[in-house]
Amino acid sequence: MKGAIVQRVVEYVTKEIVEDADSVSVTIVEDGPDEVTAEVRAAKPDMGRVIGRRGRVAKSIRTIAQAAADEEGLQARVEFID
């Protein structure tokens, strides 16, 4: 499955940030032949922690996701869904 590495990495990082790790789910959607989107869902109280002040944590997660996607030769996007 395309994006498996991205999914594992994003899920791991997100679970380390939130208080309710059981509420975290990451779904990979294939947008094209070389593009994937990681849809991140977490409990509402934890979304603030996942996004961070001025989106700094979210930006870091996106950077890490792209680094993981590079291993598979993909482009990655991360969407935070509440």
Regions found by a protein language model. Give the residues of each.
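RNA-contacting regions in translation and RNA-metabolism proteins
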Residues: M1-M47, K59-D82
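Glycine-centered tight-turn and secondary-structure capping sites
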Residues: I51-G55
